Curated annotation (Swiss-Prot):
Region (Disordered): 34-64
Domain remarks: The similarity among the IL-1 precursors suggests that the amino ends of these proteins serve some as yet undefined function.
InterPro entries recorded: IL-1_alpha (IPR003295), IL-1_fam (IPR000975), IL-1_propep (IPR003502), IL1/FGF (IPR008996)
Subunit-structure text: Monomer. Interacts with TMED10; the interaction mediates the translocation from the cytoplasm into the ERGIC (endoplasmic reticulum-Golgi intermediate compartment) and thereby secretion.
Subcellular locations according to the entry: Cytoplasm; Secreted
Domain of life according to the entry: Eukaryota
Entry protein name: Interleukin-1 alpha
Function as written in the Swiss-Prot or TrEMBL entry: Produced by activated macrophages, IL-1 stimulates thymocyte proliferation by inducing IL-2 release, B-cell maturation and proliferation, and fibroblast growth factor activity. IL-1 proteins are involved in the inflammatory response, being identified as endogenous pyrogens, and are reported to stimulate the release of prostaglandin and collagenase from synovial cells.
Upper lineage: Eukaryota, Metazoa, Chordata, Craniata, Vertebrata
Amino acid sequence: FEDLKNCYSENEEYASAIDHLSLNQKSFYDTNYDPLHENRVDEPVSPNPYENSEESNFTLEDSSDSSAVVLTSAHGEVLKKRRLSLNQTMSNEDLEAIANDSEEEIIEPWSVPYSFQSNLKFKYQRSIKKGAVITDAMHQSLIRESNGQHLKAMHVVDRKHEVKFDIDGYVSTATRIRPVTLKISKTQLYVCAQEEGQPVLLKE
């Protein structure tokens, strides 16, 4: 009993000493203080559109061979889409991870002037990827239109409708630019650029 009393007395003295510390001093173990994450006035802060769960919700799309979890905004806009196998289960933590997952880097198109194209010759270097599936920032996949000459992007659940591409790389001794070609797998149809706003054209 005397030992316990002495320990209690020592704890009281320690607590009293702590109370006299300056409020401006931050403990090494104070998890609420992190100078590395302070917002500066001169640095813009990018809002995360997925942080407020009240503005978005999840839905489940089912098909005969696969399922997909779709995150939509309050206005019905599809923000993200993730495919699931039929036997895969989702927890609240999994849904939160999907919502907070940072977006993949969006590749911006760059058009080469026709005069530049005609002055250079490129030769085949290597195959970069076989059977690649290409999606946009909204996780829409490319499918072929009914006429077979154009591609369009849309959300699909049945993966057999997705177009798969072979990506090949080319080089030239006159420039460091290394262009690539997109060809539909198991065909001789190549993706050809058209004017802005026009559908993607396929040519042999």
